[in-house]
From Swiss-Prot:
Chain positions found as Phosphoserine: S875, S881, S912
Gene: GRIN2C
Protein name: Glutamate receptor ionotropic, NMDA 2C
Known partners and oligomeric status: Heterotetramer. Forms heterotetrameric channels composed of two GluN1/zeta subunits (GRIN1), and two identical GluN2/epsilon subunits (GRIN2A, GRIN2B, GRIN2C or GRIN2D) or GluN3 subunits (GRIN3A or GRIN3B) (in vitro). In vivo, the subunit composition may depend on the expression levels of the different subunits. Interacts with PDZ domains of PATJ and DLG4. Interacts (via PDZ-binding motif) with SNX27 (via PDZ domain); the interaction is required for recycling to the plasma membrane when endocytosed and prevent degradation in lysosomes.
Disulfide cross-links: C82-C317, C426-C453, C433-C454, C743-C798
Intramembrane residue windows: 599-611
Length: 1233
């Protein structure tokens, strides 16, 4: 009875105080009741200081009411709250709920649903048990729900890759919801969670301890997630310690329910226990109450600004509850969106904060709760690893199941990425890893590490090892170096972390070598690697001088400055001193354009041969010069072939890849010998640099200035052309080549490896983990797991085997250099052109005519003669190419003989036809000169051939005559009959008149008659003064006559179709005219022809050649009548009868013009034909008496050439013979022609 009067008197006094405030003031104020769930000293002190002056900074006037409730009796609690609501006009209630006041929270939720009064829980103790709340309840909580706590706990598990765990619960209310939430979060996550076991224990007073021990000993998991109250948690951890589940090798995580108050944790709580609490876990009671009152005041003020009045106070509990009024619903909606002091206090429809800020706390070795992480805006930030070994001092603690692993970022073995910005977690197939940094939380705490996500080949190996060997780990990235190098006696990198026992294990692209093996233990290699070289394909952009790059500048200079000049001078010198070619009389030349082979023509010839240029050139005539030109032509072929073969590699750069045979290749050992110098490097402080420094010191000295900071920098330098080759681990380079965008990077030799080694896991010396890890790695190799991982991580779409040449079009960038050269040449040509005109029109007229400047004229003439050449008067004019189609008779006979040769099958006749064909071709090979005038017989007086004065009398030669002492005259073939009427020609002067006596007259005197009388100069029948175009047959030094050269095919005129069609008609006409003598009527030899009187010419007037029939014409040799070759006398007689002028033009020439068919006036002829005097060659037909027996007439043998050479030289010097003629024996078929 007395117990019930105390609260009643208290409420009565409160209501009296409230009524004394006056109505005027109450209308503008807001009444808030603050209910404390306990009567401890802190609550008593705060209740004494809680006054309206504590809330002056709020927009409304607050009238606080403090109430203390008895939590042991729910009925008394209900009576007190309902009496308060009925006596005072309360707008809202702020309730301090501890974790042990779940019954109070349920009663408050029921009262709110009945009276619609807003109730705000500020400590979060009721958040675990109030799921869901009553319908129509306005109960709001600043704590977090069980689902939100589970979400943070799973993020912690994911942070350290604790994917395997077991769940332990008690029979505390809500344990079924907890298990359901665990399964829901695990199923919704992308992480492959493994729920090893679920155990529900009776942890209350008097529970079966033996059963609890047995169930706990059956658990085999590194991580445990427990759900129970604080009292039950003390019992659970005591039993777990006895079962061996508490210690550094096990991790325990509990929700906020198991912690209770964070002021003094129980002694049974293990070190390293992890839990999740709200950010207000360190706030005082005054700050919590102030936040709750501020939320109610700000919501009411928002309602007042919109509606102009405050909401009505709450109703009485004893009144039957009706529907919620619109004003109450509006006021509740304003409470759901409140911001206070920069914090968002937005509530969900379930009454929980939408974006709560939570912290992860852990019990450190000093048995104090320490914040190790923060959950903010859906992202978890870990301050540093939660394991107690990683306290602020980072002092390591011995642990048999948890390892610290150091690694280093290097693709594809370890790839580091940033967490997902939306969730703050790592994406699938990645592992959280940390790196030292200076990150600062919003609360002002400094995080010494930054959370990152690691993946790659080595990370997958580590995850498999942790699953098989059964250990937990946390991963961090080294920042004090690379793989590991000893610098000034101190090891850095991953090796240094293991050596100085800051890490239990190091995994990554860590090469096994002897120096490292002395201080740490390595596992068996899990990847085979070595040293390889990477180069870049060309991107197709070439320099303007790419067309010059197939040869070095030294080769170009040697080619065009040295070789071309030296060979040109050599060819010129050989030609200069050749006895048959060069005109050495340059200085006396009077006219340019002669056939002289100059130094300029030599350079032009060699230049044309180099570039296969079809330009008009003049070839040398000397044998030695020709050999030199042929050797130069062969050299030019090799030069052009080598240039063309290498040009494509420089014009199409994407097809070019540098190749090296190994580290001992000359490109690495002698890089300065290359053009340009070969540039290569590596990443320092690694095994690759150590290997090169130890074995190739000169190579290492050169590559130091090209070393790169990282692999990514090296790849960029290769693509930009700053580096020619990059030397590094083969496994890394193969991955980079396979994943390169555009496949621009390749490793030489399809991934050829030098200094083969492997990657291993580094552990501390004599580590007990070595054997287990070696067995696991060998198992992975045997099961094919390693090969699968290599396929995933170490292969790419770009393969080194795809090095076939890809054809592509050349664009303007490839050919820019050639166009630039052409433009420069055009510019230089314009400058030379302008200078030429300036000199010709201006400068040369300004130079005064002075004898002092004659040296300039001589110098200019010398340069011009050197490059153009001159022709002296002694040089014979160049002969024109013969025209075989000028005489239709010759063409007809030539075609006839060719057709006859095709029809003849016998070898002898065919050979005769060949010789006859050459004979006909030789007829047209002589120079066509104007014919001599027909001359009368000797009895008719002076010769009317040329109207020139008689030469002065000269002494008669001493002796001259035919070889046998008679009057036989050897003449050449008779001229052809004219094809058209002769045309008069211009008169010519007597060019045969010389002031000195010819040498041949003094050596061989001419005599005639039977008495041996010497003929005077005017009586000589063969005077050289009557024939202006003569020829003399000459022989070589062996006695064989020179054969005339046949015209080249390009000199022959082309026959049209109408001329070719006449072939058959010409053949018929050639053999059908007149009677053809049979072969039996022809003489078998020349001697037989002279033995027959009828074969002698009729021109002889002596008695021995008279005929009974008085026939005046000599009998012609048997030939085709289509030729109709008359003897010279007939031609002369026909010319006189026709009244032709003295000059017969174009058809009848001197006897030497057709000098291939010999005729002879033998010894029986007393007189020679008068016109034979025009053939000056007759003077040399007979030599001295000592040579007469060997002179070739129509007799037996060949003429000795002993005196013919000199006769030929004299004749050329006086008459200017146009060319040599040939004397040879003729066959019967040729004589027939």
């Amino acid at each position: 009875m007395g117990g019930a009067l105390g609260p009643a008197l208290l409420l009565t006094s409160l209501f009296g105080a409230w009524a004394g405030l006056g109505p005027g003031q109450g209308e503008q104020g807001m009444t808030v009741a603050v209910v404390f769930s306990s009567s401890g000293p802190p609550q008593a002190q705060f209740r004494a200081r809680l006054t309206p002056q504590s809330f002056l900074d709020l927009p409304l006037e607050i009238q606080p009411l403090t109430v203390g409730v008895n939590t042991t009796n729910p009925s008394s609690l209900l009576t007190q709250i309902c009496g308060l609501l009925g006596a005072a006009h309360v707008h809202g209630i702020v309730f301090e709920d501890n974790v042990d006041t779940e019954a109070v929270a349920q009663i408050l939720d029921f009262i709110s649903s009945q009276t619609h009064v807003p109730i705000l829980s500020i400590s979060g103790g009721s958040a675990v048990v109030l799921t869901p709340k009553e319908p129509g309840s306005a109960f709001l909580q600043l704590g977090v729900s069980l689902e939100q706590q589970l979400q943070v706990l799973f993020k912690v598990l994911e942070e350290y890759d604790w994917s395997a765990f077991a769940v332990i619960t008690s029979l505390h209310p809500g344990h079924a919801l907890f298990l359901e939430g665990v399964r829901a979060v695990a199923d919704a996550s992308h992480v492959s969670w493994r729920l090893l076991d679920v155990v529900t224990l009776e942890l209350g007073p008097g529970g079966p301890r033996a059963r609890t021990q047995r169930l706990l000993r059956q658990l085999d998991a590194p991580v445990f997630v427990a759900y129970c109250s604080r009292e039950e948690a003390e019992v659970l951890f005591a039993e777990a310690a006895q079962a061996g589940l508490v210690g550094p090798g096990h991790v325990w995580l509990v929700p906020n329910l198991a912690l209770g108050s964070t002021d003094a944790p129980p002694a049974t709580f293990p070190v390293g226990l992890i839990s999740v609490v709200t950010e207000s876990w360190r706030l005082s009671l005054r700050q919590k109450v102030r936040d709750g009152v501020a939320i109610l005041a700000l919501g009411a003020h928002s309602y007042w600004r919109q509606h102009g009045t405050l909401p009505a106070p709450a109703g009485d509990c004893r009144v039957h509850p009706g529907p919620v009024s619109p004003a109450r619903e509006a006021f509740y909606r304003h409470l759901l969106n409140v911001t206070w002091e920069g914090r968002d206090f937005s509530f969900s429809p379930g009454g929980y904060l939408v974006q709560p800020t939570m912290v992860v706390i852990a019990l450190n070795r000093h048995r104090l709760w320490e914040m190790v992480g923060r959950w903010e805006h859906g992202v978890l930030y870990m301050k540093y690893p939660v394991w107690p070994r990683y306290s602020a001092s980072l002092q390591p603690v011995v642990d048999s199941r948890h390892l610290t692993v150091a690694t280093l970022e290097e693709r594809p073995f370890v790839i580091v990425e940033s967490p997902d910005p939306g969730t703050g977690g790592c994406v699938p197939n990645t592992v959280p890893c940390r790196r030292q940094s200076n990150h600062t939380f919003s609360s002002g705490d400094v995080a010494p590490y930054t959370k990152l996500c690691c993946k790659g080949f080595c990370i997958d190996i580590l995850k498999k090892l942790a699953r098989v060997v059964k250990f937990s780990y946390d991963l961090y990235l080294v920042t004090n170096g690379k793989h590991g190098k000893r610098v000034r006696g101190v090891w850095n990198g991953m090796i240094g972390e293991v050596y100085y026992k800051r890490a239990d294990m190091a995994i990554g692209s860590l090469t096994i070598n002897e120096e490292r093996s002395e201080i740490v233990d390595f596992s068996v290699p899990f990847v085979e690697t070595g040293i390889s070289v990477m180069v870049a394909r060309s991107n197709g952009t070439v320099s303007p001088s790419a067309f010059l790059e197939p040869y070095s500048p030294a080769v170009w200079v040697m080619m065009f400055v040295m070789c071309l000049t030296v060979v040109a001078i050599t060819v010129f010198m050989f030609e200069y001193f050749s006895p048959v070619s060069y005109n050495q009389n340059l200085t006396r030349g009077k006219k340019s354009g002669g056939p002289a082979f100059t130094i300029g023509k030599s350079v032009w010839l060699l230049w044309a041969l180099v570039f296969n240029n079809s330009v008009p050139i003049e070839n040398p005539r000397g044998t030695t010069s020709k050999i030199m030109v042929l050797v130069w032509a062969f050299f030019a072929v090799i030069f052009l072939a080598s240039y063309t073969a290498n040009l494509a590699a420089f014009m199409i750069q994407e097809q070019y890849i540098d190749t090296v045979s190994g580290l001992s290749d000359k490109k690495f050992q002698r890089p300065q010998d290359q053009y340009p110098p070969f540039r290569f490097g590596t990443v320092p402080n690694g095994s690759t640099e150590r290997n090169i420094r130890s074995n190739y010191r000169d190579m290492h000295t050169h590559m130091v200035k090209f070393n790169q900071r990282s692999v990514e920098d090296a790849l960029t330098s290769l693509k930009m052309g700053k580096l020619d080759a990059f030397i590094y681990d083969a496994a890394v380079l193969n991955y980079m080549a396979g994943k390169d965008e555009g496949c621009k990077l390749v490793t030489i030799g399809s991934g050829k490896v030098f200094a083969t080694t492997g990657y291993g896991i580094a552990m501390q010396k004599d580590s007990h983990w070595k054997r287990a890890i070696d067995l696991a790695l060998l198992q992975f190799l045997g099961d094919g797991e390693t090969q699968k991982l290599e396929t995933v991580w170490l292969s790419g779409i770009c393969q080194n085997e795809k090095n076939e040449v890809m054809s592509s079009k050349l664009d303007i960038d490839n050919m820019a250099g050639v166009f630039y050269m052409l433009l420069v040449a055009m510019g230089l040509a314009l400058l030379v052109f302008a200078w030429e005109h300036l000199v010709y029109w201006k400068l040369r007229h300004s130079v005064p005519n002075s004898s002092q400047l004659d040296f300039l004229l001589a110098f200019s003439r010398g340069i011009y003669s050197c490059f153009s050449g001159v022709q002296s008067l002694a040089s014979p004019p160049r002969q024109a190419s013969p025209d075989l189609t000028a005489s239709s008779a010759q063409a007809s006979v030539l075609k006839m003989l060719q057709a006859a040769r095709d029809m003849v099958t016998t070898a002898g006749v065919s050979s005769s036809l060949d010789r006859a064909t050459r004979t006909i071709e030789n007829w047209g090979g002589g120079r066509r000169a104007p014919p001599p005038s027909p001359c009368p017989t000797p009895r008719s007086g002076p010769s009317p051939c040329l109207p020139t004065p008689d030469p002065p009398p000269e002494p008669s030669p001493t002796g001259w005559g035919p070889p046998d002492g008679g009057r036989a005259a050897l003449v050449r073939r008779a001229p052809q009959p004219p094809g058209r009427p002769p045309t008069p020609g211009p008169p010519l002067s007597d060019v045969s008149r010389v002031s000195r006596r010819p040498a041949w007259e003094a050596r061989w005197p001419v005599r005639t008659g039977h008495c041996g009388r010497h003929l005077s100069a005017s009586e000589r029948p063969l005077s050289p003064a009557r024939c202006h175009y003569s020829s003399f047959p000459r022989a070589d030094r062996s006695g064989r006559p020179f054969l005339p050269l046949f015209p080249e095919l390009e000199d022959l005129p082309l026959l049209g179709p109408e001329q070719l069609a006449r072939r058959e008609a010409l053949l018929h006409a050639a053999w059908a005219r007149g009677s053809r003598p049979r072969h039996a009527s022809l003489p078998s030899s020349v001697a037989e022809a002279f033995a027959r009187p009828s074969s002698l010419p009729a021109g002889c007037t002596g008695p021995a050649c008279a005929r009974p029939d008085g026939h005046s014409a000599c009998r012609r040799l048997a030939q085709a009548q289509s030729m109709c070759l008359p003897i010279y006398r007939e031609a002369c007689q026909e010319g006189e009868q026709a009244g032709a002028p003295a000059w017969q033009h174009r058809q009848h020439v001197c006897l030497h013009a057709h000098a291939h068919l010999p005729f002879c006036w033998g010894a029986v002829c007393p007189h020679l034909p008068p016109c034979a005097s025009h053939g000056s060659w007759l003077s040399g037909a007979w030599g001295p008496l000592g040579h007469r027996g060997r002179t070739l007439g129509l007799g037996t043998g060949y003429r000795d050439s002993g005196g013919l050479d000199e006769i030929s030289r004299v004749a050329r010097g006086t008459q200017g013979f146009p060319g040599p003629c040939t004397w040879r024996r003729i066959s019967s078929l040729e004589s027939e022609v």
